[in-house]
Amino acid sequence: MQPTSNATVYIVDDDAIVRDALAWLLRSRHLPSQVFASGEAFDQFLDEGFVPNEPCCLLLDVRMPGMSGLALFEALIARGLAAVMPVIFLTGHADVPTAVEAVKQGAFDFCEKPFSDNALVDRIELAIAASARLLAAQRHHAHVQTLLAELTDRERDVMRLVLEGLPNKLIADQLQISV
């Protein structure tokens, strides 16, 4: 899978060695990244007006001092960002109930450290592709809403009857339009 050039992988991990290794791995695969040392730092980044206009994903350590990865994930859900920013949890302490709960809440994946570089990059690329699809759907929806808002009342009446499945002749009769 070809990475999306304008995509960003956000890395939140309290371990500087892990952050640096992940950033290096992603750079070697031509995937831009941005690193954060804590859940609070990433939460502040979001508070400063982050708007996901480009595909992205989040590599998120589960256990961190202060704001845990799970607490940050809940904050993403509350902000409505979890879908457009797929979350791949990283953990050195596999905990099946935690993994199951995170996936039930919408996490994209749950990877145990140490992980295979290739497998992780494959998951990241799939997450970015999912983000890109959702952002494209959101843009399309916004475009359709704009077009609908520009319709005249008469055009809306015609559209409503077309959507009800009426043939042109019946629409013309109902709206008293000559054919």
Question: Language model features by range: what are they?
Answer:
Residues 37-38, 68-74:
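Acidic catalytic/metal-coordinating carboxylates
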Residues 64:
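Receiver (REC) domain active-site loop signature in two-component systems and cognate sites
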